[in-house]
């Protein structure tokens, strides 16, 4: 039995778009301040045909729903240049304390890159962490983050589409249990 509580770390790893494998010298971004990750299944809904007489149902033929992805909303408590660049294609310029984030020009189109998303969630027994559930989405592409700026803290919400990594022959999602978190 797993008792999962609190996202401990999120790792985004750039993929080679032709092979689906991790890109050599690709971007790897780590989030240690993730607040929430919502995974909504994307389904191709099956059909249901009913054959009936005026006063009774004679037969029902159904085809199953099939999953072909997840739509993910990842909320972070900080705004990371590496994450924004990988997920949404932001260009980052300037010095570390005075960085400038810019969306691509319209003529450039979308410049986000495909990536793998690993979400690590603590697994508890009593009051102790025994290991971590590693939720892996094997092929993702992002959108520009939603911005809600007001009286409170700004927390970017990254919208991500996770699909099967056909090139690498990997499923949409995998869940494994690991003993430790990866090093930064």
Please place each PLM-identified region on the residue numbering:
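Solvent-exposed edge beta-strands and adjacent loop segments
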Residues: 1-86, 138-150
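Short acidic, gly/pro-rich beta-turn/loop elements at beta-sheet edges
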Residues: 82-86, 91, 127-129, 145-147, ...
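Mixed-charge, glycine-accented linear interaction segment located at domain edges/termini
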Residues: 131-184
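Surface-exposed, low-hydrophobicity beta-strand/loop segments enriched in small/polar/acidic residues
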Residues: 35-37, 94-100, 106-129, 160, ...
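Extracellular-facing segments of soluble proteins and assemblies that are Gly/Ser/Thr-biased and enriched
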Residues: 64-118
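N-terminal start-of-chain detector that recognizes signal peptides
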Residues: 42-49, 87-93, 106-110, 128-135
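Acidic Ser/Thr/Pro-rich low-complexity disordered segments
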Residues: 18-28, 120-131, 172-180, 184
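Exposed beta-sheet edge/beta-hairpin loop segments within beta-rich domains
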Residues: 64-65, 104-109, 127, 144-155
